[in-house]
C-alpha cells in the first residue's frame, strides 16, 4: 500500500563534473509506466542539500518525469534545465540552480504521485520490473 519504490546509485566520490554537457540521455524499458529520474548535487559543507537532509529523509532532488513505452526501449533526453528542484515529491521555489559540476547521486523511482497535487497517471500498483539500460550525457 506504499506510494513509491525507488533505487539509488551509490554516492559518487569524487563527485561527477558534467558541466561541459547539456543533459542526460536514459535508455529504459519501463513497460508503460511513468517514472521519475532524480539527481542529487552537493552544495558545499553547509549547503542546501545538507539543510534539506535535516528536514526530510529524501533531501533535495532535481527531478524529471519519464513516460515509457509499453513495449521496447524508451530513449529520452533530459536537459539539465528541465530538472525541477523537489523535496518529498513537492516542487520547491527557491532561487537555486542545478549544479552540473557536483553531481552526487542518481535515483530512479515509480511513485503514485505526479505533478504537485496530482496523481501519476502512469502509476500501476503491484509488482514492478523495469530495465535501465544506460544513463549517458550529451
Language-model segments: residues:
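Beta-rich carbohydrate-recognition modules and glycan-binding surfaces
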Residues: 1-138
Amino acid at each position: 500500500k506504499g506510494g513509491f519504490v525507488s533505487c539509488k546509485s551509490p554516492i559518487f566520490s569524487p563527485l561527477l563534473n558534467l558541466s561541459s554537457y547539456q543533459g542526460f540521455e536514459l535508455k529504459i524499458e519501463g513497460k508503460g509506466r511513468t517514472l521519475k529520474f532524480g539527481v542529487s548535487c552537493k552544495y558545499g559543507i553547509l549547503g542546501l542539500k545538507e539543510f534539506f537532509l535535516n528536514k526530510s529523509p529524501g533531501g533535495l532532488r532535481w527531478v524529471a518525469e519519464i513516460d515509457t513505452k509499453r513495449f521496447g526501449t524508451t530513449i529520452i533526453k533530459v536537459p539539465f534545465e528541465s530538472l525541477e528542484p523537489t523535496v518529498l515529491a513537492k516542487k520547491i521555489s527557491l532561487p537555486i540552480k542545478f549544479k552540473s559540476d557536483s553531481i552526487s547521486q542518481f535515483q530512479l523511482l515509480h511513485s503514485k504521485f505526479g505533478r504537485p497535487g496530482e496523481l501519476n497517471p502512469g502509476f500501476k500498483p503491484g509488482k514492478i520490473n523495469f530495465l535501465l539500460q544506460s544513463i549517458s550525457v550529451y
